[in-house]
Amino acid sequence: MEISACVKYVGVNDHQVDLFEGQYKVPNGMSYNSYVILDDKIAVMDTVDGFFTEEWLNNVEQVLDGKMPDYLVIQHMEPDHSASIPAFLKKYPKVTVVSTAKGFQFMEQFFPEFFADQGLPAEQRIVAANDGILELGQHSLHFVYAPMVHWPEVMMTYEATEKILFAADGFGKFGALDAEEEWADEARRYYIGIVGKYGPQVQAVLKKAAGLDIQTICSLHGPVLKENLGFYLKKYDKWSSYQPEESGVVIAYASVYGNTRNAAEYLADVLQEKGQKTVLYDLARCDKAKAVADAFRYDRLVLAGITYNGDLFPCMRSYIEGLTERNYQNRKVAIIENGTWAPMTGKLILGMFEKSKNLTFTETTVSIKSAMNEQNKGEIGKLAEELS
């Protein structure tokens, strides 16, 4: 793929992976992106997952067309982007590696035979300074530290001539490049799942990016972004500031025998009759990452759960943990609890959100004993009024 006359894509698609990072379902695979900048000095931007080292090296070799690379720039040390560093150094032993100080620390930890003790000599290492510049000829690389987006060593790189932001994992998405799907849904699921905890750090990077003339965004996952960049930047601003994108109600339920599900579905019907958009999730069976992402997408959330062994049902507890560890906030939340002899769900859910910011809980909490009755239906109607 040609990004410009001098900037080439050399990444790979992975259709073997079924769970990214061991937990996120990726039915359309993943891409691990890498780029080559051709100039008086040649820079290779990041590597790829170790399962695809040979394919990546072949891609790089084809673009180099007999030339030797001068720099290997490592923006992010997570193994899906760094695992091919050793093979690259074996093939191009004179290359200079460029990264942050923390990046080199992680290289020593991952690849001690190449970077610790008698490994890569000092003259083949450049510690990139924040706001530092590396001249390639007609192109220059301006390094921008982006700690905790989403690892501490991360930096992004701005190339001023082509006006390209090499964004590390920023603006990435699930899915291989040959997957035909819209960017937003899988980018949201990727962002909320992997980066979502670090909203303030993303906001800091967006402020830095606001001062740059960016015409292309090259992420380490997903497509190269060239058109309507304001759309992507606004999405990231919304996600990282924990503001809802849309008006709608997510109803997430945990049900053993179907009684709590019946209540959740009844509420969904009532809300839809009132013109409210609703999204229903069976937490025992759904893609939890999507259910978490949609809780951030919409402005209202209903949690309908049962008491189980004097506690929350496991999938409900896990779901709420997925929200709180990503700093869920600025939403309205409602609770439907069910228990045959001692409903405790409401109290337990409130306890899990004790440290959360700017959550508003509805005045009505629906408490069901075993199965929904006419009184409960009336309470659900009242709850629907509060949510509308």
Which stretches of residues belong to each language-model region?
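Short N-terminal or domain-adjacent regulatory/targeting segments
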Residues: 218-245
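Active-site metal-binding motif and surrounding structural segment of the metallo-beta-lactamase
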Residues: 51-98
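Short, charged N-terminal beta->alpha structural module
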Residues: 252-274
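Metallo-beta-lactamase
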Residues: 2-5, 99-154, 198-204
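Active-site neighborhood of phospho(di)ester-bond hydrolases with catalytic His/Asp-centered motifs
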Residues: 45-47, 69-77, 97-100, 165-169, ...
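Structural motif
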Residues: 41-43, 71, 139, 163-166, ...
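Conserved beta-strand hairpin/beta-sheet module of binuclear metal-dependent hydrolase folds
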Residues: 2-61, 156-159, 163-166, 260
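FMN-binding flavodoxin-like domain, especially the glycine-rich phosphate-binding loop
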Residues: 177-217, 221-224, 266-279, 291-388
